[in-house]
């Protein structure tokens, strides 16, 4: 079975609103395996490196300040097409453009407070995972439920 990993972060707005459990539940119920989780207030340096591709854009400084303003729940999820499906589960970056049933569609209203981050490519996922987690923090384990999820 071929799987991949994606990086998902519950942003400070969603942490304050008590949405961590809901977001974790969505990924678990989909059948994805949680490989790592940490709860932290990220440093400004970490957030700047994470969003380096957006440096110089009008929203960059506000985004960095927001992401470093409070606790974030950073996670690694694994499964078939985890990056693509994870993004579909989150919904469009602008919550007002997100379909009902998606995380942002159900719980987001404003682009600047869009509840969560999800890797947009396998390459981004690999970079973000290395940025946020040490290899020793990533758990390797078998789930007995796997045959009930994958052929």
Swiss-Prot record:
Keywords: ATP-binding, Kinase, Magnesium, Metal-binding, Nucleotide metabolism, Nucleotide-binding, Phosphoprotein, Transferase. The gene is ndk1. InterPro entries: NDK-like_dom, NDK-like_dom_sf, Nucleoside_diP_kinase, Nucleoside_diP_kinase_AS. PROSITE patterns: NDPK, NDPK_LIKE. Pfam families: NDK. Major role in the synthesis of nucleoside triphosphates other than ATP. The ATP gamma phosphate is transferred to the NDP beta phosphate via a ping-pong mechanism, using a phosphorylated active-site intermediate. Gene3D superfamilies: Nucleoside diphosphate kinase-like domain. It comes from Schizosaccharomyces pombe (strain 972 / ATCC 24843). Belongs to the NDK family. Its cofactor is Mg(2+). GO terms for biological process: CTP biosynthetic process; GTP biosynthetic process; UTP biosynthetic process. GO terms for molecular function: ATP binding; metal ion binding; nucleoside diphosphate kinase activity. The keyword ATP-binding applies. It catalyses: a 2'-deoxyribonucleoside 5'-diphosphate + ATP = a 2'-deoxyribonucleoside 5'-triphosphate + ADP; a ribonucleoside 5'-diphosphate + ATP = a ribonucleoside 5'-triphosphate + ADP. Homotrimer. The active site is at 117 (pros-phosphohistidine intermediate). This is Nucleoside diphosphate kinase.
